[in-house]
UniProtKB/Swiss-Prot annotation:
<dbReference type="InterPro" id="IPR022648">
    <property type="entry name" value="Pr_cel_nuc_antig_N"/>
</dbReference>
<dbReference type="GO" id="GO:0006275">
    <property type="term" value="P:regulation of DNA replication"/>
</dbReference>
<dbReference type="Pfam" id="PF02747">
    <property type="entry name" value="PCNA_C"/>
</dbReference>
<dbReference type="GO" id="GO:0003677">
    <property type="term" value="F:DNA binding"/>
</dbReference>
<dbReference type="InterPro" id="IPR000730">
    <property type="entry name" value="Pr_cel_nuc_antig"/>
</dbReference>
<keyword id="KW-0235">DNA replication</keyword>
<dbReference type="GO" id="GO:0006272">
    <property type="term" value="P:leading strand elongation"/>
</dbReference>
<dbReference type="GO" id="GO:0030337">
    <property type="term" value="F:DNA polymerase processivity factor activity"/>
</dbReference>
<dbReference type="InterPro" id="IPR046938">
    <property type="entry name" value="DNA_clamp_sf"/>
</dbReference>
<comment type="subunit">
    <text>Homotrimer. The subunits circularize to form a toroid; DNA passes through its center. Replication factor C (RFC) is required to load the toroid on the DNA.</text>
</comment>
<comment type="function">
    <text>Sliding clamp subunit that acts as a moving platform for DNA processing. Responsible for tethering the catalytic subunit of DNA polymerase and other proteins to DNA during high-speed replication.</text>
</comment>
<dbReference type="InterPro" id="IPR022649">
    <property type="entry name" value="Pr_cel_nuc_antig_C"/>
</dbReference>
<dbReference type="Pfam" id="PF00705">
    <property type="entry name" value="PCNA_N"/>
</dbReference>
<keyword id="KW-0238">DNA-binding</keyword>
<protein>
    <recommendedName>
        <fullName>DNA polymerase sliding clamp</fullName>
    </recommendedName>
</protein>
<comment type="similarity">
    <text>Belongs to the PCNA family.</text>
</comment>
Amino acid sequence: MVKFVFPDAREWKYIIESLATIVDEANFVASPEGLKLRALDPGRIAMVDLFIPSNLFEEYSVDQETKISAVLDDIDKVLKRAKSDDKISFEVSQGRLIITLSGRAERRFKFPLIDIAGQELPSPKLNFTVAAKMLSDTFRDALKDASLVSESVKLKAEDESLWLLARSDKGEIESRFSIETGSLVEIDVKEAAEASYGIDFLDKIVSKAYRISDILGLRFATNMPLEMTFDIAGGGTLKYLLAPRME
């Protein structure tokens, strides 16, 4: 039997919208420990890694590890119908995913499970030299600013400051984040680093995922992938790994 109930359908809406920025179909794995997903976008530029421990659910019944393969757009459309005080439950039965919204009325949606080809993705082993935590909406706003002049941004870290830089024939934009200004919560620079990333993916991810957590964790190194972590209240995590853009 597989069934899990989450008390806030809106938070699930934010999670699903965030996942849908890089994948159309998702191969969730439900185990007694919790719900997880690891997937690559079709262009193999970005990877998403989601884990929600079983204790975050109001009800969680999973006897054995079970794959739940579904079209994210189907789930997203259901969640757009959710009311502010709705609970949401997911159940797997007879080859179908059953989603129930419970509030003033109980509304049930049923979708066929799908087959998703592909191998299990290993956890990347990377050596980051910069780790920082900052306000997620501040990072989102800086990306919006950078998109005015460029299709890519450079992240640069030195001492106790982090910069987001954008440059093109249209102009230049520079955003500096630090603990003293309140935009950074913490920063650890083992070695000065800089790397460039495409704004398109960054903006898609952050503009959806920032609603999940006020704080965004960033880790990177020179010309290495960027890891972005959004903590889900109670112990869950939503992580993205974005390949660098080589200049």
